[in-house]
């Protein structure tokens, strides 16, 4: 990208000015060369060709913010180098939006047409960020690049674009597609690319796009990923996130420097009834002891040891069978239920295969007809993703599942391993806008009472209470891996409640 700094005046020492800029500005920029040129009929200009980002205290920040004082000092005006953009075909297509979505579309559209065309949308999981962004694409009619973190989200974007804007030419940009042909904005109207592939592209690849959409923008925090900001300093950038200020490592500020403060809309009125089954599990002494590395408790190693307990694996299988058997014969106050779609979350990949084998054996009779259990993780095939949309049980890692995975038929969660962070996004997997709100949402939370990780449950309680989900406690052990004796420990309608014999809906046996 070429930025032009214009100046006019009498008696300006051009060489001194050039030297001053090189000293004061160049020390912040990763790459900077200043060349003089004269434009016919115009005052002299200084052209700065650079990577459009500078380094300051280890952070990468949108450069005009820092340079503004330099411009004011020399009475300069910053203007972006003009780029000629082709217009997308204009076809009258309409797709329904909720009122809150339409209000946000109007607000984003106005902001993106302003000189500093950046908008950071904060909208809770499942409330239609993708649909809002597609509406913006339709209104602006510029070649658009959508940057996503995973293949699953890429496929969801492409499916949604083809459904809502069928007249546009849409392409997936990944390593496999690029080996077959060169995918550019000349051949396609919207390109949906995975960050790991796009960050390797040179800056000229990005210049023909009139809009960049960053889905799951809070994920662009790693030293490799946020270098993409050096290359996409275009006129219009839209960031999307359900949790823009929720990173425990404090790296949110990196994204805020580029996109500005997140803007959120009024929450919709749709609510989902649900409850939490908190199982206090007393594991075998051989598996609950903390694992220390360098004299500190290692959460990952401790979780790995917890899941070596065969009774704990059986507990998850039993809870899955319990949810799988739920039907409509439940008290009216809990809504109308049908067989549940179940998501099982684990901490890391090798545990997925352990649970997959256990569940596949348990459900082998029904899997003859249709795969009931699906396993999703990084590098998953398109076939596996397609099968997951019809599976009743999906196995995910927390890291993979928190990133915008959309399965509207999923209504319950089993947290097979302890978790503290990203709970808003995890619960959002079963509270997506447009799914059946009549179905009761159920969260099964296993608390390892003898493990040092048991205290994490109180962080999860905070999110459950925010959702208004009653919390029922029950118990199980390595000697008896079947949960029983539910006791209500928190009621949103009676917050002083500490314990009660009230029980949640009982599954059919």
UniProtKB/Swiss-Prot annotation:
The Helicase ATP-binding domain, residue ranges: 110-262
Gene Ontology molecular function, alphabetical: ATP binding; ATP hydrolysis activity; DNA binding; RNA helicase activity
Pfam family, one: ResIII
Enzyme class label: hydrolase
Keyword tags: ATP-binding, Helicase, Hydrolase, Late protein, Nucleotide-binding
Annotated SMART domains: DEXDc
UniProt-listed PROSITE patterns: DEAH_ATP_HELICASE, HELICASE_ATP_BIND_1
Chain ranges passing through the membrane: none
Reported induction: Expressed in the late phase of the viral replicative cycle.
Residue ranges of the motif DEAH box: 215-218
Binding, ATP: 123-130
Domain of life of the source: Viruses
Catalytic activity from the UniProt record: ATP + H2O = ADP + phosphate + H(+)
EC numbers for this chain: 3.6.4.13
Family: Belongs to the DEAD box helicase family. DEAH subfamily.
Protein name: Putative ATP-dependent RNA helicase QP509L
Organism: African swine fever virus (isolate Pig/Kenya/KEN-50/1950) (ASFV)
């Amino acid at each position: 990208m070429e930025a032009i700094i214009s100046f006019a005046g009498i008696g300006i020492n051009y060489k001194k000015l050039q030297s001053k800029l090189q000293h004061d500005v160049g020390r912040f920029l990763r790459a900077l060369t200043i060349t003089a040129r004269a434009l016919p009929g115009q005052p002299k200009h200084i052209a700065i060709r650079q990577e459009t980002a500078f380094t300051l205290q280890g952070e990468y920040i949108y450069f005009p913010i820092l340079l503004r004082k330099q411009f004011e000092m020399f009475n300069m005006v910053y203007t972006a180098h003009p780029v000629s953009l082709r217009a997308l075909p204009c076809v009258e297509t309409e797709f329904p939006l909720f009122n809150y979505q339409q209000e946000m579309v109007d607000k984003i559209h106005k902001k993106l047409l302003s000189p500093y065309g950046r908008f950071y949308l904060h909208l809770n999981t499942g409330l239609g960020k993708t649909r809002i962004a597609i509406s913006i694409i339709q209104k602006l009619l510029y070649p658009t690049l959508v940057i996503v973190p995973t293949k699953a989200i890429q496929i969801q974007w492409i499916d949604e674009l083809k459904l809502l804007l069928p007249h546009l030419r849409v392409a997936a940009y990944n390593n496999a597609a690029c080996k077959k042909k060169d995918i550019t904005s000349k051949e396609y109207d919207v390109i949906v690319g995975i960050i790991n592939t796009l960050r390797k592209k040179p800056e000229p690849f990005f210049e023909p796009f009139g809009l960049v959409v960053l889905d799951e923008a809070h994920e662009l925090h790693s030293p490799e990923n946020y270098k993409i900001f050096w290359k996409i300093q275009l006129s219009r950038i839209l960031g999307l996130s359900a949790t823009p200020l929720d990173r425990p490592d404090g790296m949110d500020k990196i994204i805020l420097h580029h996109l500005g403060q997140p803007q959120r809309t009024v929450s919709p009125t749709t609510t989902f009834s649900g409850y939490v089954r908190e199982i206090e599990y007393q594991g075998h002494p051989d598996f609950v002891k903390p694992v220390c590395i360098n004299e500190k408790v290692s959460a990952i190693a401790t979780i790995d040891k917890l899941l070596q307990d065969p009774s704990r694996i059986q507990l998850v299988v039993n809870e899955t069978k319990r949810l799988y058997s739920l039907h409509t014969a439940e008290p009216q106050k809990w809504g109308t239920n049908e067989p549940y779609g179940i998501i099982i979350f684990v901490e890391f990949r090798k545990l997925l295969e352990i649970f997959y084998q256990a569940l596949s054996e348990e459900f082998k009779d029904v899997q003859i007809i249709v795969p009931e259990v699906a396993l999703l993780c990084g590098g998953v095939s398109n076939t596996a993703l397609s099968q997951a949309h019809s599976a009743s049980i999906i196995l995910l890692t927390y890291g993979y599942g928190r990133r915008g995975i959309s399965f509207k038929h999923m209504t319950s969660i089993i947290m097979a391993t302890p978790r503290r962070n990203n709970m808003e996004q995890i619960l959002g997997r079963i509270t997506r806008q447009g799914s059946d709100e009549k179905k009761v949402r159920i969260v099964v939370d296993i608390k390892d009472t003898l493990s040092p990780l048991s205290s994490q449950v109180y962080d999860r309680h905070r999110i459950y209470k925010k959702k208004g989900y009653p919390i029922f406690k029950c118990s199980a052990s390595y000697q008896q891996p079947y949960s029983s004796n539910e006791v209500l420990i928190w009621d949103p309608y009676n917050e002083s409640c500490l314990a009660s014999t009230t029980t949640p809906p009982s599954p059919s046996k």
